[in-house]
């Protein structure tokens, strides 16, 4: 098989030596031309560099002391070009057939990347990083990075919830290829509906995000990029099994019809049929579950004319059975014989994306996105019922260009969203329709050398939230080489879907109280907050093999209005609007160490101070560890001539004590004990096509004692399975294999 590398570099705008350089990098495989995504492009002996995007294009600021450009990518020989004129049209064709086996790997793309060049504080997690843990789905994809905290939501569903900057996932904008995904009805379980093997990369942005992505992000944005048919391998198979009775199958099948059209079919299935009660309380530690997940993607790419488009559809069916070990839904539903629950969810998604880059003006482009989703959940918890159906439509139009030169960029666009909710709680209906039309403008001064900034604003017209203005600002300053200071500020707001976001309340017998009737959504007013952030990053080397990055950030989220979820009364859960103050302060310090790209150590300390004015007074948010410590050690052996390799990973989590609400019998008005968790995985790569892995989670077997309050009387007023501060199941061993053809 012959591969050729094409490099076309074009300077943009006026003929001045300081003007940035733009270009496109492509490769040819069997006479077919494809964009080379993720290629490193940098000026020799400098830190000024970038990577190519999904179209293979890049834009790079000029270096003051060199005109030597280096382009590198794994599997291709590193190329060096002399850029001698301000306007250049260069094409290089190189036959690499006889040199591929002799390439010396001097630098590989890191699976965990914190950029010093980007203005915003964004962490990129690649699919290689996700292989370090049992990433069966998106909710389990954050165990090996310190930016996101992962916790179980209750003692029954086995569902994991993520938190960032001390606040739960509803305050995050969780998107899929920049289309809002986990929101509304899918907030509780939506992260479990994206299989881990489908994920190409995850971008985690802290603080106020871009106005182009909407107004709902308050603490940040998590965006998932899925595998692309044109770059994914033709066939992939993953088999997974664990001692907790979970079995999983993942297959990817991709086909390229010609230079323009590609398609991929992705199948995921998981099943847990075994029942476990390791703590002997008569309740299942993990639900009996069954899920099927299908996706088909079509991709059209025409680099010569500047077009790229995606058409995707997905179908998912998920069922969970939880509750008492001997619960039989056919006999016991609606009765007080045994407590049980069934959660059935069906979801369908369809999306279309179209992008155009002007061939003669590569810095100018427009994009169009539209998506439809149908989410239907039928469920009951003991004697309580909860059903929700959400029909959503979203569309986005965006135009990118420059003002004068490519240092001054802007984007402008329109968003429209529509959500129709049909919701029933114990027979009471809470139906509503949300519609929003918004416009945005964002300006970027993109000077990678010393100072860059992004300022954006948007205006939205929402039928339930009103008309409102959203400003956001990001600053980046480089006082000395490889030392970056970032500042950010911005506002956000959202409608609180109080039942969908807090489905753990149905795992209790608490009385539900909504203590407001003034707002348009459940009688409550929308949530509004400002987020402010400061970040510091410094990279340096200790000799050529040792590379270290020190980073710290401090964020404050200040709510001007919030829907308070009050668990303080042992037999009630109350929802009401904030009267007083609610502030979340988050501090993180991280050390990231690399040795010759084969050994990586990440260490982080996090501190949270989240204070809320409840009706009973100002208190720290319950079930939130004020102090957390994280460490991850990864090692990879050198790849042999036949592709064999060992990979090993060890992760440590220390979770500090957490404030408990008043109905904890063992710790009345107190705090939970602190604890530690250890996870590890060993992978043996036999060739480029086949590998096996063996891992363990919570190998110290730490468990919360008596996780269900009032378990002896599940229909009594004291029953509460929502007060969870630690794992329930204990240790878990898993194994699997991956086949790539």
Regions found by a protein language model. Give the residues of each.
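N-terminal periplasmic accessory domains that precede
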Residues: 86-93, 138-141, 160-163, 175, ...
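Short, acidic, small-residue-rich periplasmic hinge/interaction motif at the N-terminus
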Residues: 26-31, 37-44, 72-76, 86-131, ...
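Gram-negative outer-membrane beta-barrel transporters
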Residues: 446, 550-558, 577-661
